[in-house]
């Protein structure tokens, strides 16, 4: 308690007066004229009042009154709560009279009365005595309204709390035990248990007044709500006693238990229910009683446990649960994967990973997936080739194997240096679901055209004079062009045409970039070629050394045409090979020139060819000088034929190739390109030396590949 003190001035009143003191928490009270002698024949009553909720405490600091037997003459009388606390006179420390000493006077209420009385004189043996009177201090002291007052025998001015009393400085308040509600008078309690809520992880719940008889007409609802992921366990204690009937189940009073809104039991009688695992974090206990009965009720202890999920079980032998645990509880998870070569499937969806989490209701948030064998799908088609299964036909799943192959005779598979022949074209369906080769990876092989291997080669034993009509398949690389007139060319690979630059940019003509490029392949007859259709050109590449404006210089007379689309090779359409050494230009080596050019001053409708020997370069040079020609004859050219022969390429054959059979490989090689000459069948013909341009040709073709 904290104490404050306030000085109160001495009050002087005539006999019979009353002096009220304003409500304060502390102060002092004195006799009239203190510390001077007090007057005779005087009586007054001082009323000390403190705020409600406090008591008055009074202590005398000085006390000097005329002593007398029974304090009959002068005295101070103290009263409170309609009771006298004593009558006092004399001096402090003196045995005479009845001095108050250091005694503390305490009221039960917030008022105290102090009456001061003097008689007509203060004489002792004829001598007038002077007495100072008294000085007293008072203070407001907190009243503990909750303390028992039976010891004092006083009546409580306030009604007692029916259940629980709580004191505070200056007052008190009442409350009720669980299951009861404080009434309007703020002191009495009435049973009210319709919405009791418990949120702790464990605790006790009981019927009202347990183990004494519970009140009648109860409608109690005890709700337990704990964190999600916890499950509640209920254990009833002894005694368990709810009014029942021998023949009818719980007709009078009953205890109903609900978990997650579902009834899990209704109980009464004297046998306690079994321990209950509710598998829920929300439980309600409904307790109903009728108007009578004296049963003792019930009490239970509830506890919580983290909810558990069932052990995950795989749906097939290929599913793997990583780090399988003996037990899974709320917020735990597991990861499922598949054995190599299998993939997770959830419904119809392919999963890259799978994780399932244990939910607060004890179920997994996702159903267990299945593992399905990886399917690589239909193998990619191989242009100019095909594949065959080396495992079960049509099965494209994990570990299936296929063998790619090329259409023989016309195509061969591209090989890598150091690769084993047994592994070429072999692809396996991998665990990643892709077809893969050990050397090439995912990239499928290429079927490269086979060059220089005509199915029906020209008969070389026959002596040819003046040219001859070619048969189908003799020169399957032959190309018929119509750009600035008729011309020729040869097929390289399956989409490149080797020809002379001057067929695209003729000498003594203006440079033209928009000329029509008509290219035909696959037959020896012009009309049939037209029926087969023109092959669109994607790109034209002319050697940078070619000069259109220099009419006597055919240096760099070589060009490449890239077809828009690759052609399909066959017996009448095959490429020719490129040279790789100088032996193809040995003196006297026989070669073949074919074309649709002028024959005896007539336009040919069928492919014709001549057989010519490689000539001596010096002889050709001398022959040119004898004709007084200044034409350039460089190391990038060679000549063929003989002045005595009436055989030669002619107008319309330009761009065609000089083809030589390689006796070592039995392949036909394009050693030259028909470039220029002096008239037709009048001596030597001059050809672009292809060997000197092989690097340029390969570079141009590789850039597009």
Curated annotation (Swiss-Prot):
Disulphide-bonded residues: 71-89, 146-165, 161-174, 176-189, 193-220, 250-268, 309-358, 338-371, 376-429, 406-447, 451-577, 620-639, 650-680
Binding site for Ca(2+) 2: 142-143, 145, 167-168, 171
Catalysis: reaction(s): Selective cleavage of Lys(or Arg)-|-Ile bond in complement subcomponent C1s to form the active form of C1s (EC 3.4.21.42)
The protein, known as: Complement C1r subcomponent
Positions bearing carbohydrate: 125, 221, 514, 581
Molecular-function annotations in GO: calcium ion binding; serine-type endopeptidase activity
Post-translation changes: Cleaved and activated by autocatalytic processing to generate Complement C1r subcomponent heavy and light chains that are connected by disulfide bonds. The iron and 2-oxoglutarate dependent 3-hydroxylation of aspartate and asparagine is (R) stereospecific within EGF domains.
Similarity field: Belongs to the peptidase S1 family.
Annotated positions binding Ca(2+) 3: 243, 253, 290, 294
Listed GO biological process terms: complement activation, classical pathway; innate immune response; zymogen activation
Modified residues (Phosphoserine): 206
Active site: 502 (charge relay system), 557 (charge relay system), 654 (charge relay system)
Domain notes: The CUB domain 2 shows a compact folded structure in the presence of Ca(2+), whereas it has a flexible, disordered conformation in the absence of Ca(2+). Ca(2+) could provide a switch between the folded and disordered forms; low Ca(2+) could provide flexibility to promote autoprocessing and activation of CIR.
Compartment annotation: Secreted; Cell surface
Domain called Peptidase S1: residue spans: 464-702
């Amino acid at each position: 308690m904290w104490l404050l003190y306030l000085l109160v001035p001495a009050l002087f009143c005539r006999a019979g007066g009353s002096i009220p003191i304003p409500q304060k928490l502390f102060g002092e009270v004195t006799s009239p004229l203190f510390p001077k002698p007090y007057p005779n024949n005087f009586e007054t009553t001082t009323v000390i009042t403190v705020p409600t909720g406090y008591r008055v405490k009074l202590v005398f600091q000085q006390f000097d009154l005329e002593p007398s037997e029974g304090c009959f003459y002068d005295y101070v009388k103290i009263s409170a709560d309609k009771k006298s606390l004593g009558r006092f006179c004399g001096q402090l420390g003196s045995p005479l009279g009845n001095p108050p000493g250091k005694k503390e006077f305490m009221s039960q209420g917030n008022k105290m009365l102090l009456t001061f009385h003097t008689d007509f004189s203060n004489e002792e043996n004829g001598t007038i005595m002077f007495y100072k009177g008294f000085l007293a201090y008072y203070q407001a002291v907190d009243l503990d309204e909750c303390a028992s007052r039976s010891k004092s025998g006083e009546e409580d001015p306030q009604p007692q709390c029916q259940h629980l009393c709580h004191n505070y400085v200056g007052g008190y308040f009442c409350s009720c035990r669980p299951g009861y509600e404080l009434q309007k008078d703020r002191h009495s309690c009435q049973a009210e248990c319709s919405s009791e809520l418990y949120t702790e992880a464990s605790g006790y719940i009981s019927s009202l007044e347990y183990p004494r008889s519970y009140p009648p007409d109860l409608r109690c609802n005890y709700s337990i709500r704990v964190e999600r992921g916890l499950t509640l366990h209920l254990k009833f204690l002894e005694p368990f006693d709810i009014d029942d009937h021998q023949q009818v189940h719980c007709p009078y009073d009953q205890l109903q238990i609900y978990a997650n809104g579902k009834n899990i039991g209704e109980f009464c009688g004297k046998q306690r229910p079994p321990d209950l695992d509710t598998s829920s974090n929300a439980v309600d206990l409904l307790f109903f009683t009728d108007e009578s009965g004296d049963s003792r009720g019930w009490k239970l202890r509830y506890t919580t446990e983290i909810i558990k999920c069932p052990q995950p079980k795989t749906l097939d032998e290929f599913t793997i649960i990583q780090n399988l645990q003996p037990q899974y509880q709320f917020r735990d998870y597991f990861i499922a994967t598949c054995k190599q070569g299998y993939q997770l499937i959830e419904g119809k969806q392919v999963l890259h990973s799978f994780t399932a989490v244990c939910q607060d209701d004890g179920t997994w948030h996702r159903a267990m997936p299945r593992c399905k064998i990886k399917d690589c799908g239909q193998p990619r088609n191989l242009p100019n080739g095909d594949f065959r299964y080396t495992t079960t036909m049509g099965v494209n799943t994990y570990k299936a194997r296929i063998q790619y192959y090329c259409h023989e005779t016309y195509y061969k598979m591209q090989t890598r240096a150091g690769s084993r022949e047994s592994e070429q074209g072999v692809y396996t369906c991998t665990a990643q679901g892709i077809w893969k080769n050990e050397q090439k990876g995912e990239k499928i092989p290429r079927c490269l055209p086979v060059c220089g291997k005509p199915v029906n080669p020209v008969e070389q034993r026959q002596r040819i004079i003046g040219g001859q009509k070619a048969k189908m398949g003799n020169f399957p690389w032959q190309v018929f062009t119509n750009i600035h007139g008729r011309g020729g060319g040869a097929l390289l690979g399956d989409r490149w045409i080797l020809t002379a630059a001057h067929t695209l940019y003729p000498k003594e003509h203006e440079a033209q970039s928009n000329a029509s490029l008509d290219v035909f392949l696959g037959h020896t007859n012009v009309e049939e070629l037209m029926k087969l259709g023109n092959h669109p050109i994607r790109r034209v590449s002319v050697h940078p050394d070619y000069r259109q404006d220099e009419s006597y210089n055919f240096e760099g007379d070589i060009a490449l045409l890239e077809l828009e689309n690759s052609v399909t090779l066959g017996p009448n359409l095959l490429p020719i090979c490129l040279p790789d050494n100088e032996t193809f230009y040995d003196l006297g080596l026989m070669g073949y020139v074919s074309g649709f050019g002028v024959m005896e001053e007539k336009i040919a409708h069928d492919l014709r060819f001549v057989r010519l020997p490689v000539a001596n370069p010096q002889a050709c040079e001398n022959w040119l000088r004898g004709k007084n020609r200044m034409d350039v004859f460089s190391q990038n050219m060679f000549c063929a034929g003989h002045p005595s022969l009436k055989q030669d390429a002619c107008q319309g054959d330009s761009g065609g190739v000089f083809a030589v059979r390689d006796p070592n490989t039995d392949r036909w090689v394009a050693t030259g390109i028909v470039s220029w000459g002096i008239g037709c069948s009048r001596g030597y013909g001059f050809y672009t030396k292809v060997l000197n341009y092989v690097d340029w040709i390969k570079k141009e073709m590789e850039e597009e590949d």
